[in-house]
Amino acid sequence: MQLEISPRQRSQQQKEEEGEHQQRAGEEAVGAVFSIEPWVDAAAVLVPPLNFAEVNDGIFRSGFPAADNFAFLLSLKLRSIVYLCPEPYPEENTRFLEQNGIKLHQFGIDGSKELLVNIPEEKIREALKVILDVRNQPVLIHCKRGKHRTGCVVGCLRKLQKWCLTSVFDEYQHFAAAKARSTDQRFMELFDTSSLMHLTASQC
């Protein structure tokens, strides 16, 4: 024998089912909010990395980007990052690049403070080839603080742009400040640009 459900009971049952559905939807919505990466927030404040600056159209420099800089990096519409440290890229930063289609080019240069350390000229040269390839732009160049390794790469780029050494050194010292190294400036002075002169003026 099948019991009939009265209209009142049916109405109460529907209300309970609707309540459970709304509760599940609310829980899913809350879960979705917490799963969103912080850089996706449209209301996020744009905070540039330490020592950030525009070098040229489509070329930028900075210190190491932290998570609170990611929204700012998105605003640059980067295609590539040139990373000048030998240490592995942090997992959080790697995930950010992967999820936003940004390619990482790593040229590990030792950040030793020893005055007699040799700066690897070939790595600087290869980094410049990547930076000046318009297919990789917009591109961000960075090391740890955006001072020495980044400063050397940008200084060598300026030589390609025919800057005089005084201007090259002034820019380097602006970012390095009290930490400026004579060895860095000597390296930039002696850097041979002849093998890179085939790069077009528009790339520089």
From Swiss-Prot:
Compartment annotation: Cytoplasm; Nucleus
Site (Transition state stabilizer): 149
Expressing tissues: Expressed in roots and young panicles.
Active site residues per record: 143 (phosphocysteine intermediate)
Keyword ATP-binding: no
Annotated spans, Disordered: 1-27
InterPro entries from the UniProt entry: PFA-DSPs, Prot-tyrosine_phosphatase-like, Siw14-like, Tyr_Pase_AS, TYR_PHOSPHATASE_DUAL_dom
Family annotation (Pfam families): Y_phosphatase2
Example of a GO MF term: protein tyrosine phosphatase activity
Keywords: Cytoplasm, Hydrolase, Nucleus, Plant defense
EC identifiers of the protein: 3.6.1.52
All residue ranges annotated as the Tyrosine-protein phosphatase domain in the record: 51-203
Compositional bias annotation for Basic and acidic residues: 13-27
Stretch list, region WPD loop important for active site topology: 107-119
GO cellular component: cytoplasm; nucleus
BP terms from Gene Ontology: defense response; regulation of defense response to fungus
Reaction it catalyzes: 5-diphospho-1D-myo-inositol 1,2,3,4,6-pentakisphosphate + H2O = 1D-myo-inositol hexakisphosphate + phosphate + H(+); 1,5-bis(diphospho)-1D-myo-inositol 2,3,4,6-tetrakisphosphate + H2O = 1-diphospho-1D-myo-inositol 2,3,4,5,6-pentakisphosphate + phosphate + 2 H(+); 3,5-bis(diphospho)-1D-myo-inositol 1,2,4,6-tetrakisphosphate + H2O = 3-diphospho-1D-myo-inositol 1,2,4,5,6-pentakisphosphate + phosphate + 2 H(+); 6-diphospho-1D-myo-inositol pentakisphosphate + H2O = 1D-myo-inositol hexakisphosphate + phosphate + H(+)
Residues at which 1D-myo-inositol hexakisphosphate binds: 118-119, 123
SUPFAM superfamilies: (Phosphotyrosine protein) phosphatases II
Top-level lineage group: Eukaryota
Comment field (misc): Plants overexpressing DSP2 exhibit increased sensitivity to infection by the fungal pathogen Magnaporthe oryzae.
The family this protein is said to belong to: Belongs to the protein-tyrosine phosphatase family. Atypical dual-specificity phosphatase Siw14-like subfamily.
Purpose of the protein: Cleaves the beta-phosphate at the 5-position of soluble inositol pyrophosphates. Has highest activity on 5-diphosphoinositol 1,2,3,4,6-pentakisphosphate (5-InsP(7)). Acts as a negative regulator of defense responses against the fungal pathogen Magnaporthe oryzae.
Protein name in UniProt: Inositol diphosphatase DSP2
Organism: Oryza sativa subsp. japonica (Rice)
Gene from which this protein is expressed: DSP2
